[in-house]
Design a protein with these regions (language model features):
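Accessible peptide chain termini
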Residues: 1-2, 150
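Structured, beta-strand-rich domain cores
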Residues: 2-75, 81
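Single-stranded nucleic-acid nicking/binding segments centered on His-rich, glycine/basic loops
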Residues: 62-63, 85-182
Length: 182
């Protein structure tokens, strides 16, 4: 690994507190996040890459607590994982057998956050990339792809009333310190 490489990443699965409160609270949240963990396993490429997964109920939703006159907790799941991707090593032009040059020599697993979360080209109805005026493909942000994958997994797991986060949102991720300052 390069000295400045990212060795691990974190996914935070967060759902509106009202969703859990309307479905029974803590027990429902536990089952939901057990299923969300299965989605995380699929998203990161396997359970062997997950270092930690913890459901938190350590925050009170103040607005709902005041409105309902009882404590309503905010549940979320933190998943810490190693961002591993498959990388193909090709035979170089120094190979003695010229027929092998450019073909796959071996496939290795590589730690790479940038390759794990690369943006993907948007496709039209025919499956072809949508192009910008300069001829380059329009890219769908990797976090949008992640949200789509999570949403689709949870719908397939039976959570048919769940709603996907706002598409095209320009909201930025905040560190814990930035969030607390706000």
């Amino acid at each position: 690994l390069k000295p400045d490489a990212t060795h691990y990443c974190e996914l935070v699965f967060d759902v509106n507190s009202a969703y859990f409160d309307n479905h029974g609270g803590y027990e429902f949240a536990k089952q939901f996040y057990a299923d969300a963990y299965k989605a995380a396993v699929q998203i990161v490429g396997g359970e062997q890459y997950i270092l930690s997964a913890v459901m938190h109920a350590d925050e009170i939703n103040r607005a709902m607590t005041e409105a309902l006159g009882r404590e309503v907790y905010h549940y979320h799941l933190h998943v810490v994982y190693v961002p591993v991707v498959e990388k193909q090593i090709l035979w170089s032009k120094r190979c003695k057998d010229k027929a092998l040059v450019g073909t796959v020599k071996e496939t290795v697993m590589q730690v790479s956050r940038s390759k794990k979360w690369a943006s993907k080209p948007l496709l039209d109805d025919a499956g072809k990339p949508i192009l910008q005026k300069n001829g380059k493909p329009v890219l769908k942000k990797s976090y949008s792809i992640l949200q789509d994958n999570f949403f689709n997994f949870m719908r397939a797991a039976g959570y048919t009333d769940i709603e996907r986060g706002e598409r095209g949102s320009t909201e930025e991720h905040l560190t814990v310190t930035q969030f607390k300052v706000q």
